[in-house]
Amino acid sequence: MPIRKVMKANEAAAWAAKLAKPKVIAAFPITPSTLIPEKISEFVANGELDAEFIKVESEHSAISACVGAAAAGVRTFTATASQGLALMHEILFIAAGMRLPIVMAIGNRALSAPINIWNDWQDTISQRDTGWMQFYAENNQEALDLILIAYKVAEDERVLLPAMVGFDAFILTHTVEPVEIPDQEVVDEFLGEYEPKHAYIDPARPITQGSLAFPAHYMESRYTVWEAMERAKKVIDEAFAEFEKKFGRKYQKIEEYKTEDADIIFVTMGSLAGTLKEWIDKKREEGYKVGAAKITVYRPFPVEEIRELAKKAKVLAFLEKNITIGLYGAVFTDASAALINESEKPLMVDFIVGLGGRDVTFNQLDEALEIAEKALKEGKVENPINWIGLRWELVK
């Protein structure tokens, strides 16, 4: 029988790793994700998890050790955040290019400078082009579930790409919620044994991995990574369906909330989706025709789902805890690209919110709604990017 425990998202991530039975875990502690490797090391030390826990001197070494272990043919796991993920950047491309299905948990945290240990999505968003799949959890239960799903998709022979699962720093990593821990036997049925056919060590059949590619072959190598990410879209849907059948919890690439008759649909990710849904309920009671959409899978980007969502709205409003310096928020930019060739599309407006752990309040969402309502009334967007909750007196 599944058991329910009250735990932080960090603990939920550690439990997910335990349930997945990786053979090698390599990690270096960093706020706010430190508890993840701590808890896993306890599982290993207590004999609850049969695995090699590698203590390393940096995040660069942690991901490098995982690459080596995955290349040897075993299931691997790591965890990090913020500057730690940034330090891994070089090796993230290598993991994807070598088609190694490593799974990594991320306590989403702002990047320096200035130093900030609180939440936004900039760390993972900055890695969106590395070839890693990206999942974002709204709550602690999703942190556990999405790690299991990430393994299922990553290890599928149609995909064979690494995956990261993000959950908001402190808002989730250090906040306790009830979490259902599934039966080990059911997880074993869901994931199965990892038996790679492309990456392994066999003295009788030596192979070279990650070798030099001349111009005559490099482009084809990059294409296969892109193609695998495209195939992952279908595999993710299949994994979601199987997960629901076995565990009773439903996931979608984009989860909609009260969008059926909405004129304005707000789009976001992570724990902010919970706040947004509460606010939507309040606005509905006040007579506003608003809805919400939560992106669970950011890479591969849910192009078709965004197009279907756009058909329901007159205005798509994006709430983003990230900023692409020199353009807009990343989700807004990607959604704009997804809709560029559509003959009919809604007005689109982007809101930058909550950077560095700043609270996103109902009053701020009201401000965003006012701007979106103005665009709806006038039939045009005055400013595509809007900073909400900014202390303007400090920047002028």
Curated annotation (Swiss-Prot):
Organism: Pyrococcus furiosus (strain ATCC 43587 / DSM 3638 / JCM 8422 / Vc1)
Top-rank taxon: Archaea
One Gene Ontology molecular-function label: pyruvate synthase activity
Keywords, sorted A to Z: Oxidoreductase
Name of the protein in its database record: Pyruvate synthase subunit PorA
Group of enzyme by EC: oxidoreductase
EC assignment: 1.2.7.1
Catalytic activity line of the entry: 2 oxidized [2Fe-2S]-[ferredoxin] + pyruvate + CoA = 2 reduced [2Fe-2S]-[ferredoxin] + acetyl-CoA + CO2 + H(+)
Assembly and interaction partners: Heterotetramer of one alpha, one beta, one delta and one gamma chain.
